[in-house]
């Protein structure tokens, strides 16, 4: 609910909903992964006694695996190489060499660098781990963003600091006046490969920029070079209405930029 209110610009309601989600989840035993837990928590299903921080997930069994269409296959040098990180993101993250999130990246000097959030764990060939959709970390970041937008710096610091210090206990935002950029940068680092960044940029009226830089740790990266920059006016932000739906309703108007 907090995410919906954010997209509507209703930040007071977004803050209330995010805080309610945090309180409700923690009352039920959910908690942010610790710095020590973070690198290996991915790919391991939670238990009733230790639910971790994943609030909503898609149940996934080995027999459910779509094989070469699975998330792990998209994110592997043995697969399609379609979910590799960019050099610009890597350079943002490695500004702090002690950031625990560096430990979920893997590098193949011959090819690309990957995020190991969806790959098989413990020597498995096919992952049977559930796929996380909503984490407690996201609720904290939603609360921090909404607090910045409503001018409540104390709450913004409270919620953002939990994520910052989990990434590196030596860091803190205590005593700082936080900006939207501070929160969005932390969202970019924490929620990488979870489907948020483009929407974070677009809903805040910013421009998506694919920055073409080099880094000695990464041999290759991928960009859609046809669209190096775009904003909320770009027609492909909205998908076309399927032709089947258009055929079923002659009064239906196709989304702008697509042929009726």
Which residues fall in each region the model found?
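Acidic/polar-rich alpha-helix caps and helix-coil junctions
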Residues: 3-73, 81-84, 94-260
